[in-house]
Regions:
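ATP-dependent NMP and nucleoside kinases share a basic, alpha-helical "lid"
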Residues: 34-44, 49-85
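Short alpha-helical
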Residues: 20, 32, 57-58, 77-78, ...
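Residue-level recognition of specific faces of alpha-helices
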Residues: 14, 21-24, 50-53, 68, ...
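Generic leucine side-chain signal with a strong bias for well-ordered alpha-helical environments
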Residues: 6, 11, 52, 56-57, ...
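ATP-dependent small-molecule kinase phosphotransfer cores
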Residues: 1-48
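Small-molecule kinase domains that catalyze NTP-dependent phosphoryl transfer to phosphate-bearing small molecules
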Residues: 36, 64-65, 81, 85, ...
Length: 140
């Protein structure tokens, strides 16, 4: 890439190790992200269901855009291992990112449905299907 390309890994190291830098970046980015989601949702307003996948939903204050919140959950050990594997982070970098997030218990309390992703794919699909069941027996 060229000099204008964003080095996401370097930026992540900076903002997740320094709370002041993270707050500064969030103050710049979160309003732009919110505006983008509001625009996308307006375009999709006639759809019966719209799914948003937002890693920092509560932290960014984007939960107000949602009529229902499903939280995908796993053990802290799995969360750390998955971040290291998926994002190529060191253990310390992954821990810094987790420390920057709300505690999972706080997120669980605000979720309408918690999807346990600590097992296999079939367990995950069953958990998603349980969240999709409505009180009247219909699904999404």
């Amino acid at each position: 890439g060229n000099a204008a390309d964003l080095d996401r890994k370097a930026l992540g190291r900076i903002v997740f190790s320094d709370p002041d830098q993270r707050r500064w970046l969030e103050a710049l980015i979160h309003p732009v992200v919110r505006e983008r989601f509001q625009h996308e949702l307006a375009e999709l307003r006639d759809e019966p269901v719209v799914v948003l996948m937002i890693p920092l939903l509560f932290e960014a204050g984007l939960d107000v855009l949602c009529s229902e919140i499903w939280l995908v959950d796993c053990t802290p050990k799995q969360q750390l291992e998955r971040m290291i594997q998926r994002d190529g982070l060191t253990k310390n970098e992954a821990q810094d990112r987790l420390q920057a997030q709300w505690p999972i218990a706080r997120k669980r309390d605000r979720a309408d449905c918690v999807i346990d992703n600590s097992g296999g794919v079939n367990d995950l699909l069953a958990a998603v299907n349980r969240c999709g069941l409505r009180a009247d027996g219909t699904t999404w």
